[in-house]
């Protein structure tokens, strides 16, 4: 959980800055604010394009040399890229070189995170006791809300003491304060490396090595023998990603925008920090339900709830009637649902694949879903709300949730599977 918390902290630090900082410091200042925001989101989405590549690279080594060593590499890749973002010059200083360097670092972040999640999930699932695999696997999932809490909490502290006005680039926060969360990641990475070096390799992988079942080319093998689970896992995961980046990144940009809800940035960060506790609470609940009621039935019910949630966007977020109270309710409900759908995924996706390609297969499904769900969600939602209104964003979530529901209904129940036999 420590490693995934650090990885997600690094990722969310960028996501927050993509809304409040980068449109003004890394893209031409004469742009329309919406254009600058869309450009920032485009760079934001670049990491998601890198994530499947990261899952292929790190998945190869994870299935060949082991889960432990590969996770050290993924953490270093993410940590170094995040630290370097904190040192980048701005557009005003070096022109077009600034967004180019930002995009490169964001790409490297994506590579690191692409190899992180599946390795952490496998460490949990391949060491869990019988009947408690989803419960064990939910611990790495807690890294997502804890990383988000740390990233946004630090931004909140900085904004409180240094000040921030949306669009203002002269204040202390926009001049140098925004760099602090990126630079501090180096300390967290050192802690994460200490933890990772003390880990033991999973018994399931050791057994695969002893029996000579390692794949020589995991990427080739997974597409040859497990292409159906690849497709299924991708669509099972896609609504989870879409929901999360709608109720975090997109809603932050919409909430603080003058042509949106015009809530002060500091106030909106507070609302997000309160709501994240619903995410933390619902992940263990989902893990318990997935072990007792089954993965499939749990995910079907949560998907139906997510579809219903899509119909509430207009009620909670319409500019004419929305208040901070209604936004807090929206965020809290959205985060609670997010935990319910995200919690079982670290058990479900690895259970779809055999041991010799499990790192590669689960990683590809998880990270291709990040392109189809997370990478485009803020961009699509921003375009939809500007043309059709906030209700269209809810319809977008509904459509994606239906696609995931179909995939979940097609999958087999996996809670009784033996990880050494599949």
Regions found by a protein language model. Give the residues of each.
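Extracytoplasmic gate region of multi-pass secondary transporters
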Residues: 15-16, 227-279, 373-377
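Extracellular/periplasmic helix-loop-helix junction of adjacent transmembrane segments
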Residues: 18-51
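C-terminal ends and interior cores of transmembrane alpha-helices
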Residues: 28, 76-95, 304-321
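Helix-to-loop junctions at the C-terminal end of transmembrane segments
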Residues: 55-67, 283-295
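Cytoplasmic membrane-interface "Motif A"-like loop-to-helix N-cap segments
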Residues: 64-76, 292-304
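Glycine-rich segments within core transmembrane alpha-helices of 12-TM secondary carriers
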Residues: 135-160, 366-377
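Multi-pass alpha-helical transporter architecture, strongest
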Residues: 192-199, 400-422
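C-terminal transmembrane helical hairpin of 12-TM major facilitator-type secondary transporters
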Residues: 296-344
């Amino acid at each position: 959980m420590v490693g995934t918390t650090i990885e997600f902290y690094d990722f969310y630090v960028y996501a927050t800055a993509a809304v409040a900082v980068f449109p003004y410091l890394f893209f031409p200042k004469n742009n329309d604010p919406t254009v600058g925001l869309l450009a920032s989101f485009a760079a934001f989405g670049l990491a998601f394009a890198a994530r499947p590549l990261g899952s292929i690279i790190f998945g190869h080594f994870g299935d060949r040399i082991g889960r432990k060593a590969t996770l050290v590499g993924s953490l270093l890749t993410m940590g170094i890229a995040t630290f370097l973002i904190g040192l980048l010059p701005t557009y005003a200083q070096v022109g077009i070189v600034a967004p180019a360097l930002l995009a490169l670092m964001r790409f490297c972040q994506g590579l690191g995170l692409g190899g992180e999640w599946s390795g952490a999930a496998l460490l949990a699932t391949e060491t869990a006791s019988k009947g408690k695999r989803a419960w064990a696997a939910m611990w790495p999932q807690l890294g997502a809300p804890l990383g988000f809490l740390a990233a946004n909490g630090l931004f909140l502290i900085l904004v409180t003491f240094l000040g921030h006005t949306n669009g203002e680039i002269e204040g202390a926060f926009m001049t140098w304060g925004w760099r602090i969360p990126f630079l501090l990641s180096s300390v967290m990475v050192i802690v994460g490396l200490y933890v990772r070096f003390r880990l033991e390799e999973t018994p399931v992988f050791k057994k695969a090595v002893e029996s000579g079942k390692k794949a020589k080319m995991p990427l080739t093998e997974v597409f040859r023998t497990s292409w159906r689970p690849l497709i299924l896992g991708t669509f099972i995961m896609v609504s989870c990603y879409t929901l999360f980046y709608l109720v975090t990144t997109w809603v932050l940009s919409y909430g603080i925008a003058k042509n949106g809800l015009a809530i002060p940035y500091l106030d909106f960060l507070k609302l997000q920090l309160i709501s994240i506790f619903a995410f933390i609470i619902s992940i263990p609940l989902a893990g318990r339900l997935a072990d007792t009621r089954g993965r499939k039935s749990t995910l079907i019910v949560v998907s139906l709830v997510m579809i219903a949630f899509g119909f509430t966007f207009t009620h909670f977020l319409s500019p004419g009637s929305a208040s901070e109270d209604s936004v807090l309710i929206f965020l809290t409900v959205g985060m609670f649902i997010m935990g319910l759908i995200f919690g079982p995924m670290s058990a479900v996706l690895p259970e779809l694949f055999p041991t010799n390609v499990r790192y590669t297969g689960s990683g590809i499904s998880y990270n291709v879903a990040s392109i189809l769900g997370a990478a485009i969600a803020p961009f699509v939602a921003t375009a939809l709300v500007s043309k059709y209104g906030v209700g269209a964003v809810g319809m977008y979530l509904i459509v994606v949730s239906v696609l995931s529901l179909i995939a979940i209904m097609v999958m087999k129940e996996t809670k009784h599977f033996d990880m050494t036999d599949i």
